[in-house]
Curated annotation (Swiss-Prot):
Consists of 3 domains; the N-terminus binds the ribosome, the middle domain has PPIase activity, while the C-terminus has intrinsic chaperone activity on its own. SUPFAM superfamilies: FKBP-like, Triger factor/SurA peptide-binding domain-like, Trigger factor ribosome-binding domain. It is found in: Cytoplasm. Belongs to the FKBP-type PPIase family. Tig subfamily. This is Trigger factor. InterPro entries: PPIase_dom_sf, PPIase_FKBP_dom, Trig_fac, Trigger_fac_C, Trigger_fac_C_sf, Trigger_fac_ribosome-bd_bac, Trigger_fac_ribosome-bd_sf, Trigger_fact/SurA_dom_sf. NCBIfam families: tig (TIGR00115). It catalyses: [protein]-peptidylproline (omega=180) = [protein]-peptidylproline (omega=0). It is an enzyme of class 5 (isomerase). Involved in protein export. Acts as a chaperone by maintaining the newly synthesized protein in an open conformation. Functions as a peptidyl-prolyl cis-trans isomerase. The gene is tig. GO terms for molecular function: peptidyl-prolyl cis-trans isomerase activity; protein folding chaperone; ribosome binding.
Amino acid sequence: MSVSFENTATNRGVVTFTIGQDKIQPALDQAFNKVKKNLNVPGFRKGHIPRAVFNQKFGEEALYDDALNAILPAAYEAAIAELGLDVVAQPKIDVKSIGKGQDWTLTAEVVTKPEVKLGAYKDLEVSVEVSKEVTDEEVDAKLENERKNLAELIVKDGAAEYGDTVVIDFVGSVDGVEFDGGKGENHSLELGSGQFIPGFEDQLVGAKSGDEVEVKVTFPEDYQATDLAGKAAVFVTKVNEVKAKEVPALDDELAKDLDDEVDTLDELKAKYRKELEAAKEIAFDDAVEGAALDLAVENAEIVELPAEMVENEVHRAMNEFMGNLQRQGISPEMYFQITGTTQEDLRKQYEADSDKRVKTNLVIEAVAAAEGFDATDEEIQKEINDLAAEYNMEVSQVSELLSPEMLKHDIAMKKAVEVITSSAKVK
């Protein structure tokens, strides 16, 4: 096979390659055997037309598309491998010369991985705003949050306050006309929770049981029900009950209720402190990793980032996110409905930092190459086992989905990140 490469721009070029008759003829034979099965030609049984008759009647050219589709992927990959190119996007293939008895010549417009010139990536000095210290106030705050979760709602006399729950009947109308979904009975609403549209809950503060309040609001411009968006509405609201939260006493009994592994409040606080310390340790390490990677990228020189790489990263991130949702039993449609967003909103979210993610990955790959990182069979098997456990999959499923080369790449990347972060020094 003849192969050549012409550089047309930074990280772009054209690969010209030929496919020889040793590959073409078997592919034509295979294409003929596939096509003839469905051919009805007078004088021959279905599927038994001789090759010579087929060529005379239809022409060998009728087989070219099927034959080319069969051999093109391997021929293209062989050409790329021979040239040692690292292609990062789908090529644009063009047939230049194809005919009977001759080698076929094709071109492929390709986008190649940009060159990365590494700067300093070890012993980096970084600053992080995350502290590993756990204060008494943080322990008390966690305890108070857990205590509030055990609060009971008790009917109270007097005016409703923020944090109270009101049980209400309501009927909404726009220009005096009731609308679908604007009516409810015995609905429990915590004031200040933000469950209802802005301004609704505020107007019930101060109301008492038995009061009837005309709540006047305006639907947000981006309200999910487009027929109501931006419109003024009135909700005639009757307050049936006002309930206040009654939290349990802060004592050893509370500690036992919150955690059956402790007997006293002091033991519970000690346990919470350890949990907070562990969480802060992880947050601190993540912050150091992020800062070190950012600095390593800043120190590196990347020659023109191809737009295709950024676009591929957006697609990859979105697909990964959607896959994680579906593993939790949440369909894309359900997610967009719950969040009030669209696929375009999600795309914009991932586009925002896709450029940074691509550059970071390129630098990590360059570090892995510079350090000569590889993966042993034992490391690959451990990675498979870890992924199977993380995603609740069978080990065999993970092995089928991920090739050894993909796993080696991921392991080398992890080693490179470890080299960058483990040597980093926090200012």
